[in-house]
């Protein structure tokens, strides 16, 4: 029996979007959903209670970083991630593949796995598909990911094909190594670069392995938005209707809405926390850099339409002052706001799906935010 169950509640008559709910051992979450990223078993600047206040239903943690520090053995002793970080709602862990291929000084990719140098101290490490699953079994998240190879953009066709076929073999090894399928759902990850036929090949090969959910990886890595949408349009229709679909590493408002219109259920990204730390905030009328001098005497909220703690209590002028003074509260408030903005955006997306008006909502939002339709 699978650790999770996907319930399809409604299909949007105006688009390919769907309203759903995913049930896990630690409760359910509504889809389409944005998952805040807690890389080091914490969403930067936010406590678990604050994450609940902004209505985060599920968060993501990072296998690579937790393996490096403090080590999965410590997390397991503490009662898994849920006990370690005192979070009683669903958690998803990535496999560490993306970090191994992007952060580390790569040494060698072989069929057995990947040898790499730590980004912390330069020490040499090896991760195989079996090890990635063992680490995630110890971390204890509700949803875990197969170990995949993340190729750069651009990549030539032959390498993309060779890589996706290795990713399929690794996915089978991950499934064979998984020791806790009744408590942790293992998702396969579709790869294939920016080639339609390779994306289709990857999807078909993973479908044969019958995972409880499917992710689409290797997108939003520098390619034009039109290409990402093309890859979604050839991949998503191949994925099972009765299982969740997860677009990895995507979190800008336009990508969230466009992904939802194409049938994606789950998204994650560090964008809201990362840009918040740099003084950039998302508003219903577009991004603003609140630390800029223009806001020194702006006594309005970050976004008058937002209901978050920062917008209910503080002004742009005050938050700018905090950021310019190097006060931690400034970063906390911009982070709080950005996370709430995206979580609330997904609530509006779900409501628009329920009312069969997602494309209308998209057009209205894009017009106010300053996006162009592609």
From Swiss-Prot:
NCBIfam families given in the database record: Q_tRNA_tgt, tgt_general
Entry's family note: Belongs to the queuine tRNA-ribosyltransferase family.
Role according to the record: Catalyzes the base-exchange of a guanine (G) residue with the queuine precursor 7-aminomethyl-7-deazaguanine (PreQ1) at position 34 (anticodon wobble position) in tRNAs with GU(N) anticodons (tRNA-Asp, -Asn, -His and -Tyr). Catalysis occurs through a double-displacement mechanism. The nucleophile active site attacks the C1' of nucleotide 34 to detach the guanine base from the RNA, forming a covalent enzyme-RNA intermediate. The proton acceptor active site deprotonates the incoming PreQ1, allowing a nucleophilic attack on the C1' of the ribose to form the product.
Pfam families in the record: TGT
Signal peptide: none
Entry GO MF terms: metal ion binding; tRNA-guanosine(34) queuine transglycosylase activity
Chain residue ranges for the region called RNA binding: 249-255, 273-277
InterPro entries, per database record: ArchSynthase1/Queuine_TRR, TGT, TGT-like_sf, tRNA_ribo_trans-like
Annotated residues for binding of Zn(2+): 306, 308, 311, 337
Binding site for substrate: 94-98, 148, 191, 218
Identification of the protein by name: Queuine tRNA-ribosyltransferase
Subunit architecture: Homodimer. Within each dimer, one monomer is responsible for RNA recognition and catalysis, while the other monomer binds to the replacement base PreQ1.
Catalyzed reaction equations: 7-aminomethyl-7-carbaguanine + guanosine(34) in tRNA = 7-aminomethyl-7-carbaguanosine(34) in tRNA + guanine
Highest rank taxon of the organism: Bacteria
Active site (catalytic residues): 94 (proton acceptor), 268 (nucleophile)
Co-factor remark: Binds 1 zinc ion per subunit.
Enzyme nomenclature, EC number: 2.4.2.29
Alphabetized Gene3D superfamilies for the sequence: Queuine tRNA-ribosyltransferase-like
Cellular component, GO, one term: cytosol
Keywords on record: Glycosyltransferase, Metal-binding, Queuosine biosynthesis, Transferase, tRNA processing, Zinc
């Amino acid at each position: 029996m699978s650790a999770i169950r996907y319930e399809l509640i409604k299909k949007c008559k105006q688009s390919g979007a769907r309203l759903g709910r995913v049930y896990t051992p630690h409760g359910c979450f509504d889809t389409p959903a944005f998952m805040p990223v807690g890389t080091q078993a914490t969403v930067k600047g936010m406590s678990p209670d604050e994450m609940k206040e902004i209505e985060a239903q599920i968060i993501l943690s990072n296998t690579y970083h937790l393996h490096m520090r403090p080590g999965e053995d410590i997390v397991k002793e503490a009662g898994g991630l849920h006990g370690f970080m005192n979070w009683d709602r669903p958690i998803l862990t990535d496999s560490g593949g993306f970090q191994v291929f992007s952060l580390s000084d790569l040494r060698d990719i072989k069929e057995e796995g990947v040898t790499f140098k730590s980004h912390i101290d330069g020490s040499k490490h090896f991760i195989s598909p079996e090890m990635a699953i063992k680490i995630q079994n110890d971390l204890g998240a509700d949803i875990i990911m197969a170990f995949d190879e993340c190729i750069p953009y651009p990549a030539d066709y032959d390498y993309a094909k060779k890589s996706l076929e290795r990713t399929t073999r690794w996915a089978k090894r991950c499934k064979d190594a998984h020791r806790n399928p009744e408590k942790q759902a293992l998702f396969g990850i579709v790869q294939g670069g920016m080639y339609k036929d390779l994306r289709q090949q990857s999807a078909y090969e993973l479908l044969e392995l019958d995972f409880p959910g499917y992710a689409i990886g290797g997108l939003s890595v520098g390619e034009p938005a039109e290409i990402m949408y093309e890859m979604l349009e050839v991949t998503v229709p191949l994925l099972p209707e009765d299982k969740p679909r997860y677009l990895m590493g995507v979190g800008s408002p336009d990508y969230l809405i466009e992904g939802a219109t194409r049938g994606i259920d789950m998204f994650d990204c560090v964008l809201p926390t990362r840009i918040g730390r740099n003084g950039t905030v998302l508003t219903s009328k577009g991004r603003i850099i609140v630390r800029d001098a223009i806001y020194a005497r702006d006594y309005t909220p970050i976004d008058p339409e937002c209901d978050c703690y920062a917008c209910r209590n503080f002004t742009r002028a005050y938050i700018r002052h905090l950021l310019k003074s190097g006060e931690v509260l400034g970063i906390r408030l911009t982070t709080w706001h950005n996370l709430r903005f995206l979580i609330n955006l997904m609530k509006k997306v779900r409501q628009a799906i329920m009312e069969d008006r997602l494309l209308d909502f998209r057009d209205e939002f894009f017009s106010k935010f300053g996006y162009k339709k592609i």
